[in-house]
Structure formats: C-alpha cells, structure tokens
C-alpha cells in the first residue's frame, strides 16, 4: 500500500543534487530580541551546579621551601585554572579562562585572553525531510551562524594559541543540554528575560543566530489540536540559506530518542515525555542511514511533565503484519455504515500539503536495528463506494447485452422426453458436487505470525450429499473423450456405497432413443444448431441407432463378485462371448501395501494396530484434497509450513504408489518411487524405508516376471494356450503404463512384438493399413496398442486372440465392429479390490494425469508446481528395453520385430533422473595430469556431494577431464610444460613450439570424439603472455577442425581449481540427460573406446541407448544419431563411428591441405604404428607373445580361449572383427590358432590379408556395397536384386554396419590377392610401405567400382615379402629419436608420416619373392556366373556362423566362390576386347594392365634379384620430392580447354604407363577429401558444335 507521501531515498541521491534541491527547516526569528549580554558567573555556577570533588591537576605540597624550590626548578610551570570553568562546561570545550589570580601562579601577571562569545539555537537542530550527504557519506545538520572574523588568539607570554577554527565550531554545536522551562509553567507566556537568563552564552561579542524559534508562538499552540499545531508551525517557516561548511557531531540519543516512547500516546495526550538531558556524544558516521524527519515541540500534559531534549520523528505509514483474524473481523463485522469523523482542517485549501508530504521520509530509510517502530496504517473505508454484493451483480448483469434467439430455438426438442424421472443427470456424467465442512485451525508460529490450515472435520468423511450418476451420455464414450478422468474413482472413491445392482438406463430409454433418432431428420442434429457451418449431415442414421443400442448396459456395484461393464462398450452380440478373468493383488503386493499403511499412519500420527473406521477414513482421503492441502500449507514460507507441505506430499506419494502397484505391478511402482525419491532429499528421507522394501521385491521379480503383478500370469497362460492351438497373432490392449511389464513378459516367453507408439502423419489415428502394406504386422507375434490408438476401422480380423487388460477399468473400453463374420477370441482381465482392505482404501480417490501436458511436465502456476509435477509423474516407457527398438522413421509407427532368443538385460528407466558423470583420466599422456595434483583432484571428488559421479578411466586421449560426451578439459602447467619442452625440443629456435604441437596433434585427435575443448594454462605472467600471443594459432587450428575452443589463464593453483569447478558445474547444467556409468570399465566399453571417435562417455551412451551393442549396430545411421543426440554426443563422432564400422578406418585422416596428408605409413621404427583403432594399454591380458605368424597357421583355427568374452551367443550378437587384429601392435599380436577361432576369417586355403574397405566415405559406394573380401564381393553385386543389405540374417549382425575383412593399415583398396605361404611372416612389417606411392594426379575413377583379385599392388600396411629376403636388417634401420620430435601429447593415435629421408633410407629394402604367388589362380580368376542368391546367402551364413574351420571342408566352398563374378572394373581389366569408352578410361585400363604384367615379372625373379627397374635411392628421392603429399584439390582444378594441357596430360599418362619406374610409386587410392573442401563442380560430357564430345567442369 502506498501513502500519499513522497518516497525519496536521500542516501542514494548524489550529494550535489541533494544540496541544490533541498532546504532545511526554516525557523522564524523571535519576536522580542534578547537584551545585551552580560556575563554573570554566579548564575552559571548555579545553573550547572557545583562540582565539589574535583581536584586540581597538581596540588600544593606542604613541604619546606627547599622542596618547593626544587620542584619549581624540576616540575613544569602550572597554569592556574579557576574551578568555575569546570562548572560551566563539562564537555571539555578546550577554552579556559580565569577572572582571579593565584598568588603562586606562574602567569599571574599575564592578561586574560579575550573570549569570543557565541550563542547556539535554543531548540535542537531542526531539519525538514531532506538531508545532505557529503562525499564521505556522513550525515550533517546545517544551521547558519553569523560569520565572526577573529584572528587566532595567542596568550601573552605563552606559546598556546587558541584557534577559532572548525574544532571550536564543532564544540560549540555539541551542547547537549538546552532547557526550556516554559513547559513546566501554567501560564502560556514566557518572560523575555527568563529566556535569556536560562540560555546564557559563554562568549562575548556574538550575535544571535538567525536560526531561532519563537517560543511564545510555540507555547500558544498548546490549546490547539495536534493537526492545527503542525500546520501552524509549518506556516510560520520561512526560507533560509544553508551553510554546508562544517561537519557536526550528532547526539545519537537525541535523534533516535523517540524509540523509547509511544508516539500514539504523545499525539493523543498532547504532551512531551521526560527525557534525561545527559547523553553520550557519538560521531555522525554511525547514523548516516538515519531516517530523520523533523523536530516538533508539543505542549505538555499533566501526565507527563518535565523537560525533554529529544525530537519527535515521523515515518511513512506502513502496513504491519497483524493478526489476520482482526482483519477478517473488520470486514465481516461491518453491519451498518458509520459516519466518519471529518476534520475540516485536513481539507482546508490554505494548508500546504506539499510541505507536509516532504516532511515524511520513505520507509525504505528505516534503521536496520528497528530503531523506529512502524505505525499501523488505519483502515479507511470509502463509505460512498461501499456497496452490497447484490448491487455489484446487478450492475454486471445489466451491462450484459442480451442476444436474440435463433430461428431454430423453438425447434429444439426437450431432452426430458428421454427420461421418466423429474431430474436428469445424464447431461453431466462426470460432474458431482460434494459438500464438506472445513474448519480453520489457527496456530502460532515464529515471529508472532499465524499459520492456518484446513482440518478435516468428521463431516468431511461422510457420504457426498449428491447422487452420482455413472450413466454416460448417449452415443459418447466417456473414457475416450475424457482421458484424465479417474477410472477407478467410481469404484473406490466412496467406501459407503450400497451393494447391489440398479438400472441406470432401462430398455424403455433405448427404445425411445431409437425411435427419436429415426424420426429426426438430418437437420435435427444438435451440432447443426450449435454450429451450422461445421455440422456434418449424415445420410445414414443407422450408426446413431446402433450407438444408442450400445448404451443399454447395466451399472453394477463395486461388489467384487459382480462383473461391471460401466464406462465402455462391450463386444458385439454377434461375436463370441467375452471371457472374463478376475485377479486380486498377490501376497507380496499385499505385504508391501501393509508397509505403506504403517508409514501412512505414522505420518498422520495414528499408530494403533487395528484398522478402525476412522483409519479407513484417513486412508481414503482423495488425491485432490491432498494437493489442495499442499498448496495451502505452502502459502506461508516458514519451516512449519514446509514440514506440512512435504508431509502431505509423502501421503500423496504413498497413495499414488499403492495405486500403481495394485493395478500395474511392482515394476511400475518401483519406477515411480525411484523418480519421487530422486526429486528432493525430504522425499528421499521420508520414503527411504519403503524404497528399500520395494527395491528388494523388484529384484526378485527379475527372475520371475509374473511376481510383479498377478495379471501377467493370466496373460502368460492365455498366450501359451492360444499359441499352442495354432493361433499366431495376438492383440494386447493396455494402458501405456503397463507396456513395460508386458514387453518383459513377452521377451521372457520368447515372443516377438510390435507397438503402435506414434501416430500416422496423415491423421490423428495410426493408419494400421500402412503398416500392413509395409509388412510389419505379420512379422511379430503380438501387437501392443493403447485405447487411444484404436479406431472403428481397426483390422481385428488379422488377429486370432485379443487380450484387454482393464487395470483400473471394470469393463472393456473398446467396441468391435459388428460386420465381422468371425470374431477373434476376446479376453478381458479385471482387477478386483476389497474396499474394506488397505489396498482399496489407499487406492480410493487416486487419479492419473494422462494428459500429454502433464506427462511432459509443463509448469504449474503454483508455488508447488515442481512438487505436483513429481507427484503426478507417469512412469511411461521412455527408454528402450532389451528386445525393443525405436522407430527408424518418423512416418513409421511400429518398432522392428523382436527375436526370441535375445538377452533379457533391461536398461533401467529414467535416465534423466540419474546423476551426471565426469571422467578423470588416470593415464599420463606426455604431461602432468590433474589427478597428480592432490588438492585439485580432491576438490573434483568433492563434487560427488553435489550429485556428480566421478569415474576414473585409463584413456589414451590427451585430456584431463571428460565433462560430457562432447566437452573435454585440458590443463597445462608452465613448469611441467617447460621441462618437457626443454627435454624434447633441445635447442629449438622457438620456445613455444609445443603450442604448435597442441594445434596440430592434440586438437586433431580430440576433434574426432569431442566438439568442445577447454584449455587451462597455469603459470607465471610471462608464460601466460606467451600463451596469449600464440593463442591465435590454437584458435585457427580449432576453427579448421570444427571444434570449439575455450582458453583460460590462471596465475595460481587456487584460481585453476575455481575455473575447473566452474566448468564442471556449467557442463552439468547444460547436460540434461546423463548416463549411469559403472566404476570399472566393461569389456564392451573397452572395445568401443578403441574407435578414435568414441570416448568413454560416448561409449557408455551407446551401451545405454539400446538393449545390446548388436542392436545399436543394426540401427540405421539416423536412428543412431537420434538416440545419442539427446546426450549431447557430437553428430560427427557418430558419423565417423558408423563409417569406421562399415568401411574401416582411413590412414590419411588428416586434412588434405597439409603436407602430412600422405597415404604412406610410418615404418616399424616409428614409435606409433598407424592404427585406426588403438587400445593403448587397456586389457593387457589380451597381448600375445608371438609376433610372427606362419602362413600355414593362418588358415587353421581352433576354439577361442582368450576372447570368449568378446563374442556373444549364436543369436547374432556381436563378434570381434578380425579387422582389428592387424591394427594394434600392443594388444592384437595374437595367434589365431588359440585366440580367434570365432572370428569370421576367410575359408581355409584362401587368405586375404589385404582385404579392407576402399573408403570411409559413404558416397564412394553403392547402397549395397559391403565387405571387401573377395569371398563376399559377389554377394554385393548389383545383379542380385533379391538379396540386399536390409535383409536381416539370423545369427549375424547387419551387414550394412559391419565388415569382416582382415584389414590392413588405415585404408587401402579391396583386393583378392592371395598370400604366399612363407616360412616367416610379419603382419606389421611396414618397411616397404613407401614404395607404393604413385602418380595419381589428374585421373578420375568411378567411385562405385571395387577392385578385386590382383588388380593393384597390396596395401602399404602389410609386407608381402619375408624378412629374410630383405637387403637391410631391421636392427640396422635408422630409428627416429624422441628428442628430435616436437613435444607430442598424443603419440598413440595420431599418425606420423615418414619424411623423404626416411623413404630414401628404406628404399633399398624392396625385394621380390620368387615363390609362386598365383597357384590355383585359374580357379579364382575364372568366369562370372549368376549364382543363385539363396545359395549365396546360405554359403555366407555358413561361413560367418561356423565355430571352427576345417581346410578339407572349405576347399569346395572356395572353388564355388571362385566362380563369382568380379566388379565391372575387374571384368574390364581381364577382358581381351577393347573397351568402348572415352580415351581417358582406355588409357587408365591400359596402365592397370601394364602394372599387373610388371608385378608378374617382378614376382618371377629370384628372391635375391633386384627389381627390374633397378632404381637407385636418388631416383626414389627425386620422385618423392616431386610428388610428396599432393593436394586432392589439384585433382579437381580446372586446367582449361586448350590443347596444350590435354597433350601434357596424355603425355604424362603415356609415360607413366610405359615406365616401370613410375608404377612402383603408383597408388590407386585417392586421399579422402573433407566435405567442405570438395570441388563444387563435377565432370560431365558435353558436345560442341561439330558433334565432338569432351569432359568439362560444370
């Protein structure tokens, strides 16, 4: 409430502005000016009283003259002071004078100094409502005193100088006692001399100040009222100039003395209060925030007489927290109008209201120590505006404009014709009015405030006073139209209903309705009259007649023995009889409900054992009433109100949990309880005991699904019996809450299922016919749907059995079509609860919010909205359980069919409720990690108290913390970085070269698996300045890699800790969903982290997003992105992961614009082999001791021993790909004889060490492109239309996402070259890798073609020649020193490419092999025939699922595969006919043939012979220098259309094809070009005017 006074904050206003605009209280000059001042010392002594016990500073010593002389020589001279000086002023003014002389005084002959006499105002310093605040924010009072020019007074003969400066002025104004005796006298006049006698100045030659109040005028106001006094004083105030030159000392007790007195008494009795004149002087700083208004003197009263030295202060009126019952009494007890008392002075026009308003200061300036007590604001009633409620209603209704009746108003038929009773309730089937007596209970709480609450009286539990009609409105299904309605409310809400059956709608009503509908025309429809524009004219009224017939059913009582059919439609009479199954809560559910009852009664403080009638009433309190109590208890923000709020919330949670358990099982109740306990600590503490009991029972349900709810056992029996009779299709109708339990049951039974979980894009209802056309429904055994997804056109004829679980519904809710000739077997399961039992009472009055808005958790406009949202949580299936899959397309609305032998591992629901997770890297990666600093790591561990799970992982990624799947944090310390840089760089010219290493190596490796990188640099200012200078290099590198970079600089360890903790908290807030991560690393996580784009958090997301890893691998790429995107997994990481899984990894993963983007691998002397999936030091138990493998052993397999855990069951789960075996030099040096028998190696006798995917770019392949093995290439040919990737092969993973070749280094072409059987073979000998660089510039190749057999040289990742044939021993090879490299923080994953010197030094190692490589080549190089797809599929399935390989049995299969055709390119190369194509294609094929013949010539030479080309290191160096790291963009540059360029290109092609020297450097694999760097044009043929065609860029 705002008063009419101004609210001005004087302390926040600038001092200059206040000084210019504000004035002070102007007091008038006295009418009788004082007479000349005459000093009278006697009066001063009498005035202040004598001080008897004051001793002189040094007393006269009664000793001899000698001693006196001695003392006079030693002791300083004394100054004689008259004792009367102390009687005059006890405030130590510092000015002393004497009018007498002492005989022994040292200054007896000196003249008395001249004293300046001034006078102070008689009244205290008065102010208006304006204060001036100086720059020091001190409070100052100003009063103008005449300036007196006086020079400093110097005592004669002494060095003492009396200054007349600011100190004197402050002491003058610090007079603390100014009497006014006229208050104690009876007359109203004061003598003139009396005033001057009582207020004698202490100095001479002083003029009376202008700031003075006429005492006579003030005393004459004693006979006036308070209001007249105030305005009289205000009228006499005149403007007065102010002087802000002095800083005053304010008496605190004088300014705030009013706090000790009741202002109401002062104003009512017109008196002053007694106040002691003695006060302490304090500095003004302590009262800079005072709310000083003004000082007024009011005449005395007989009750309080005396002198007062304190002012009366005013403050703005405020509304106080008073007893609310008094407020109610004021408004409720006004029975008659009371004439207000009018004060005519208040409305006088002569009154200056503006000045009076300015006297009142805003309440915002009140003292913090409650020095001023706010006055209660009186309630002023405007009796002229007060009117009765009837008058208000009358005015409102009178303003309503009447609307004219429509022409069809008289045509309406009275609806009471349909009823024989006087009152009809069918129009409002869901409305009821219940009257309850509610009492107010007032309880005192903290701070003298009153808290009220509703107390349910005995009448509240009585039967509702109105009759509830359960008859639905004709032709409308109440449950379909009103989903949020409590379906159990009609059965359980009223425990006192009478048993027995009664007819709600008799047969006569149905007959009348039938006749009425037949007699009505199309225009008699109600919708036509309500809205003719939207009305639909029905040509056939039979549907309405049938709808009226369906309402002829009985409404039974809640007796459990009687079947109820209320609230829905039953099967058509033409169909078979409905089979009713009644179930009751099982013993384990009843035991848990008993625990719930104990906790419930404990909360309401009723702990007796027997369930009396009163306790039943307590248990049956409805959910709506409890929510009202929660809202009302939360009105007052006190501790008592909070306790009551959570008490009511616990009661409601127990009732809701019991309802879920009784109708949907323990599993659903556990999910709900888990959500509630995670919402807040009070709820978790209150439900801790119940949570333990439910969790224990829930764990036991995992072994036996039917223990969750007895209805599951009934459904299991129905399905087993129906399927045993040959019925293969079942339709399950249930609420979505029950879907999770149904799916668990079906998986345990080995049945596949689908669910219609999303609507069709063409309408509100799902179009099941579209699903049938797509072939989904016939695949699965069961279809799960909800009531909202059923339409009258639902094809129930496709199912042999229909099972509807009613849950809280007592009767079926679906009406089947009447036109069906054969109706399927229909089973309805109903749950029966005994109302006198605890289950029935706790479930009474509970509703479930099926509204979509409530499910999503929209904000409720109440203070307890979040609590209501948690209590209304519906445990729907939000995550995919094992055996189920989400939709792959938005237009599809059913999931993929489930296989019967899948694992039953269940992902716990509610990922959004689990704690957030951060990963700490415990492995040292070329720098000091955060975990090595104990103080920082302890603070990170302390985050677990705030709900953050801290997990340790030994990761090869050069990060300290992984805050989320997309965010990582790195910490660099100047000391460790400097030491490392000095040790590795040596005499490097740049001391910050490690910055460049971070930009090129670290950020590149992190860009695969993270989208945001946070770097914290800690060190001295010089180190930080150097980092900032080089920051542009880091930002440029991050921008080119597409990763967001944030850099922080810290000068101390504490600041570093603060930055890290802030980053963790920020990441937790941004990540809404988190996965629950185990403390130890699982085998699946260890496998996934070998991918360069998968970090531990991303791996956990992949494992948690579906039931199994195999299921995730089978998903399309779009579904993978959708599942991981909600956990903030970068889409690029998922793309790279999918590409690596499908095509394998590329070696040239760096940007093609850098010099390091070469396809050449580093040799064996390199510290890091170029692997696409590196496991680091994880799982050391998998490392084998053997480093070389004999080729005779490669084709022999034995059962797996060490990798048994990596392979799942024969149901088709994941098997470890042998492509990883050739990539990791630390882990996968294995002997296939003992380690990888289950891996899908090639058949015996056919080894394909060089099989790999051509590219990780999906655009390079046809849709049906697949593994690169020659044994499977024919399966992916385009001439096999009846076999595709999309076909699900039982027992094997999706071929679209998986490959099974033996893989070379990062990427190489697909080849089917056989491997010679050698005595010693090293899979990881890369010494000859650099010999395969070739001139591939300017050529265009069809990316859809695949290269088979011996088309191209083998991959640089493998050495085709034995180590004994090498010219140089491995020990003699030059090794690269670690000190010669730059500081590398990521040496295990980032490929290192050899330089020209390395290539030169290893060029002489090339040698050929004499052994015959192409034995049995005829069988592999034969013809292509159209092998039947069915046979292909059988053979492939046999190979991939075989547990062991026997050479004798696989030879026929090898021969059969040899007849499969090759790719178009392979066939063109082997063809003897000239290819009719463009010149560049012919030239390209000729070059391929030349290379093939050259290789054959080389292989025919003995092992000790040199290559035919006899190349020298110099030649190799020249070739490599010329063509080192060509940019892929050069391939796409437009060279122009002139003949010169064309001649050069043809000449180069001719030379390259004819020269055997160049062919050794040829590599058919192009470097992978990023999407953003690809050419914007494409090559195409165009015809010129002469009819010739040529290739041009478009």
Swiss-Prot record:
Q: In which tissues is it expressed?
A: Highest levels in young buds, where male meiosis occurs. Also present at low levels in plantlets, leaves, flowers, and roots.
Q: Does the keyword Nucleus apply?
A: yes
Which is a Gene Ontology cellular component entry for this protein? plasmodesma
Comp. bias (Low complexity):
1151-1165
Please indicate if the UniProt record lists Nucleus as a keyword: yes
Q: Where in the cell is it found?
A: Nucleus
The protein's predominant localisation is: nucleus
Q: Where is the composition biased (Polar residues)?
A: 1577-1594
Ranges of biased composition (kind: Basic and acidic residues)? 1254-1265, 1402-1414
The lineage's top-level taxon is Eukaryota
Q: Which UniProt keywords apply?
A: DNA recombination, Meiosis, Nucleus
* GO process annotations (BP): resolution of meiotic recombination intermediates
**Ranges where the record places region Disordered:** 1148-1180, 1239-1283, 1396-1426, 1491-1523, 1536-1594
For the null mutant, the annotation states: Reduction in the number of class I crossovers (COs) during meiosis. Impaired fertility due to altered male and female meiosis.
Q: What does this protein do?
A: Essential for the formation of class I meiotic crossovers.
Query: Its quaternary structure?
Result: Interacts with PTD.
UniProt record similarity statement = Belongs to the XPF family.
State the name under which the record lists this protein.
Answer: Protein SHORTAGE IN CHIASMATA 1
Q: Which gene encodes it?
A: SHOC1
């Amino acid at each position: 409430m705002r008063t009419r006074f101004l609210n001005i904050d004087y302390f926040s206003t600038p001092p200059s502005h206040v000084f210019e605009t504000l004035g002070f209280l102007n007091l008038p000059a006295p009418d009788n000016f004082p007479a000349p001042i005459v000093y009278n010392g006697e009066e001063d002594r009498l005035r202040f009283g004598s001080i008897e016990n004051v001793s002189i500073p040094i007393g006269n010593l009664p000793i001899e003259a000698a001693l006196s002389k001695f003392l006079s020589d030693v002791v300083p001279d004394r100054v004689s002071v008259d004792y009367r000086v102390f009687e005059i002023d006890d405030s130590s003014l510092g000015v002393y004078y004497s009018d007498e002389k002492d005989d022994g005084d040292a200054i007896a002959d000196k003249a008395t100094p001249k004293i300046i006499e001034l006078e102070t105002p008689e009244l205290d310093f008065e102010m208006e409502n304006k204060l001036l605040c100086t720059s020091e924010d001190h409070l100052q009072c100003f009063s103008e005193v005449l300036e007196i020019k006086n020079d400093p007074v110097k005592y004669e003969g002494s060095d003492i100088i009396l200054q007349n400066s600011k100190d004197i002025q402050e002491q003058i104004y610090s007079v603390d006692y100014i009497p006014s005796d006229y208050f104690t006298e009876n007359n109203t006049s004061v003598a003139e001399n009396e005033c001057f006698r009582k207020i004698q100045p202490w100095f001479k030659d002083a003029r009376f100040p202008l700031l003075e109040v006429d005492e006579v005028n003030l005393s004459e106001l004693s006979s006036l009222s308070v209001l007249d006094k105030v305005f009289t004083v205000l009228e006499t105030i005149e403007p007065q100039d102010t002087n802000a030159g002095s800083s005053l000392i304010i008496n605190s007790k004088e300014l705030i003395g009013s706090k000790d007195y009741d202002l109401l008494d002062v104003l009512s009795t017109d008196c002053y209060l007694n106040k002691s004149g003695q006060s302490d002087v304090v500095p003004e700083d302590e009262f800079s925030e005072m709310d000083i208004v003004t000082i007024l003197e009011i005449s005395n009263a007989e009750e309080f007489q005396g002198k007062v030295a304190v002012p009366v202060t005013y403050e703005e009126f405020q509304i106080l927290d008073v007893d609310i019952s008094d407020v109610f009494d004021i408004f409720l007890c006004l029975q008659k109008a009371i004439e207000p008392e009018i004060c005519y002075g208040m409305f006088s026009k002569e009154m200056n209201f503006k000045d009076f308003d300015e006297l009142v200061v805003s309440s915002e300036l009140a003292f913090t120590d409650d020095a001023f007590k706010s006055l209660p604001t009186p309630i002023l009633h405007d009796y002229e505006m007060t009117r009765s409620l009837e008058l208000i209603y009358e005015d409102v209704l009178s303003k309503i404009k009447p609307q004219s009746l429509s022409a069809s108003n008289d045509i309406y038929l009275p609806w009471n014709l349909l009823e024989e009773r006087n009152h009809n309730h069918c129009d409002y089937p869901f409305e009821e009015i219940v009257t309850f007596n509610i009492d107010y209970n007032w309880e005192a709480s903290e701070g003298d405030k009153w808290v009220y609450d509703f107390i349910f009286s005995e009448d509240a539990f009585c039967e509702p006073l109105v009759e509830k009609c359960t008859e639905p409105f004709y032709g409308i299904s109440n449950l379909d139209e009103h989903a949020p309605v409590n379906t159990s409310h009609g059965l359980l809400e009223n425990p006192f209903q009478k048993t027995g059956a009664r007819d709600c709608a008799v047969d006569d009503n149905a007959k009348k309705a039938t006749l009425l509908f037949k007699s009505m025309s199309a225009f008699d429809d109600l919708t036509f009259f309500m809205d003719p524009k939207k009305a639909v004219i029905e040509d056939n009224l039979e549907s309405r007649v049938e709808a009226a017939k369906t309402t002829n059913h009985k409404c039974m009582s809640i007796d459990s023995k009687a079947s109820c059919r209320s609230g829905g439609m039953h099967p058509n009479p033409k169909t078979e009889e409905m089979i009713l199954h009644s179930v009751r809560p099982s013993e384990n559910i009843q035991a848990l409900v008993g625990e719930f009852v104990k906790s419930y009664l404990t909360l309401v403080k009723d702990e007796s054992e027997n369930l009396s009638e009163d306790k039943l009433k307590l248990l049956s309190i409805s959910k709506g009433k409890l929510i009202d109590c929660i809202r009302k208890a939360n009105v007052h923000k006190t501790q008592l109100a909070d306790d009551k709020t959570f008490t009511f919330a616990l009661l409601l949670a127990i009732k809701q949990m019991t309802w879920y358990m009784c109708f949907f099982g323990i599993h659903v109740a556990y999910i709900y309880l888990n959500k509630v306990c995670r919402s807040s600590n009070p709820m978790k503490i209150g439900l801790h005991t119940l949570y333990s009991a439910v969790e224990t029972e829930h764990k036991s349900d995992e072994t036996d699904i039917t223990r969750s709810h007895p209805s599951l056992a009934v459904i299991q029996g129905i399905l087993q019996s129906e399927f045993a009779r040959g019925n293969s299709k079942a339709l399950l109708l249930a609420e979505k809450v029950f879907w999770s339990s149904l799916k668990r049951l079906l998986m345990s039974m080995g049945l596949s299922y689908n669910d219609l979980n999303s609507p069709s894009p063409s309408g509100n209802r799902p179009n099941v016919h579209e699903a049938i056309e797509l072939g989904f429904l016939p695949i699965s055994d069961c279809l799960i749907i909800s009531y909202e997804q059923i339409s009258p056109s639902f094809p129930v004829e496709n199912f042999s059995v229909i099972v509807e679980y009613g849950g809280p519904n007592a009767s079926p809710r679906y009406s089947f079509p009447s036109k069906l000739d054969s109706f399927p077997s229909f089973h309805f399961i109903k749950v029966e609860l005994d109302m006198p039992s605890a289950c029935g009472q706790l479930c009474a009055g509970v509703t479930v919010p099926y509204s979509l808005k409530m499910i999503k958790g929209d904000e409720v406009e109440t203070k307890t909205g979040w609590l209501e949202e948690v209590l209304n949580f519906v445990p729907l299936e939000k995550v995919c359980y094992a055996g189920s899959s989400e939709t792959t397309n938005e237009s599809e609305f059913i999931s993929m069919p489930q296989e019967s032998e899948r694992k039953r591992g269940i992902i716990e629901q509610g990922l959004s409720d689990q704690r957030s997770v951060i990963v700490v890297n415990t492995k040292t990666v070329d720098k000091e990690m955060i975990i090595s600093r104990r103080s920082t790591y302890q603070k990170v561990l302390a985050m677990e108290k705030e709900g953050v799970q801290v997990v340790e992982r030994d990761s090869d990624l050069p990060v300290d913390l992984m805050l989320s799947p997309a965010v990582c944090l790195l910490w660099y310390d100047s000391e460790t970085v400097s030491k490392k840089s000095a040790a590795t760089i040596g005499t490097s010219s740049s001391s910050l070269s490690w910055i460049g290493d971070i930009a090129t190596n670290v950020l590149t490796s992190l860009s695969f698996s993270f989208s945001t990188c946070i770097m914290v640099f800690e060190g001295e200012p010089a180190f930080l300045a150097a980092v900032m200078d080089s920051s542009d290099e880091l930002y440029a590198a991050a921008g080119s890699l597409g990763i967001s970079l944030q850099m922080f600089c810290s000068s101390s360890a504490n600041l570093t800790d603060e930055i890290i903790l802030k980053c963790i908290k920020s990441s937790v807030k941004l990540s809404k969903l988190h996965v629950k991560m185990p403390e130890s690393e699982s085998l699946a996580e260890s496998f996934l982290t070998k991918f360069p784009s998968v970090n531990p958090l991303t791996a956990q997301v992949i494992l948690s997003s579906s039931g199994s890893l195999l299921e995730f691998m089978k998903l399309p790429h779009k579904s993978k992105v959708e599942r991981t995107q909600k956990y903030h997994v970068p889409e690029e990481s998922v793309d790279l992961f999918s590409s690596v899984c499908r095509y394998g990894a590329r070696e040239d993963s760096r940007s093609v614009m850098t010099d390091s983007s070469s396809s050449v691998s580093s040799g064996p002397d390199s510290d890091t082999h170029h692997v696409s999936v590196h496991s680091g030091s994880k799982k050391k138990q998998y490392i084998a001791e053997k480093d070389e493998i004999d080729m005779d052993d490669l084709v022999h397999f034995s059962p797996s021993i060490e990798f048994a855990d990596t392979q799942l069951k024969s149901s088709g789960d994941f098997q470890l790909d042998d492509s990883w075996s050739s990539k990791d030099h630390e882990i996968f040096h294995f002997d296939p004889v003992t380690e990888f028998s289950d891996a899908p190696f090639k058949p015996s006798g056919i080894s394909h060490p060089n099989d790999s995917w051509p590219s990780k770019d999906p655009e390079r392949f046809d849709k049906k492109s697949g593994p690169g093995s020659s044994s499977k290439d024919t399966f992916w040919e385009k001439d096999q239309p009846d076999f595709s990737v999309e076909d699900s092969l039982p027992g094997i993973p999706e071929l679209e996402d998986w490959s099974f070749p033996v893989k070379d280094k990062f990427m190489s072409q697909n080849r089917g070259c056989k491997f010679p059987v050698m005595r010693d073979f090293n899979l990881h000998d890369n010494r000859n890798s650099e010999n395969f660089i070739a001139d591939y510039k300017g050529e265009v190749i069809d990316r859809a073609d695949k290269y088979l057999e011996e088309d191209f040289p083998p991959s640089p990742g493998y050495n085709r020649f034995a180590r004994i044939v090498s010219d140089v021993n491995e020990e003699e090879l030059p090794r690269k020193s670690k000190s010669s490299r730059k500081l590398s923080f990521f040496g295990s994953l980032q490929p290192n490419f050899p330089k020209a010197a390395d290539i030169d030094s290893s060029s002489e190692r090339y040698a050929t092999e004499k052994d015959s490589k192409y034995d049995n080549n005829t069988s592999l190089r034969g013809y292509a025939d159209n092998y039947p797809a069915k046979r292909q599929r059988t053979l492939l399935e046999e190979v991939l699922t075989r547990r062991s390989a026997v050479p004798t049995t696989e030879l026929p299969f090898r021969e059969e595969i040899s007849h499969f055709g090759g790719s178009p390119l392979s066939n063109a190369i082997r063809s003897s006919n000239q290819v009719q194509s463009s010149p560049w294609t012919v030239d390209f094929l000729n070059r391929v043939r030349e290379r093939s013949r050259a290789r054959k010539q080389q292989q025919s030479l003995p092992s000790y012979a040199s290559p035919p080309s006899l190349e020298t290191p110099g030649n190799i160096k020249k070739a490599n220098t010329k063509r080192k790291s060509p940019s892929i963009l050069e391939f796409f540059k437009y060279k122009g259309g002139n003949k010169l360029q064309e001649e050069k290109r043809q000449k180069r092609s001719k030379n390259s094809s004819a020269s055997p020297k160049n062919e050794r450097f040829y590599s058919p694999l192009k470097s992978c070009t990023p999407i953003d760097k690809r050419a914007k044009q494409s090559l195409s043929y165009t015809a010129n005017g002469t009819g010739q065609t040529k290739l041009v860029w478009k």
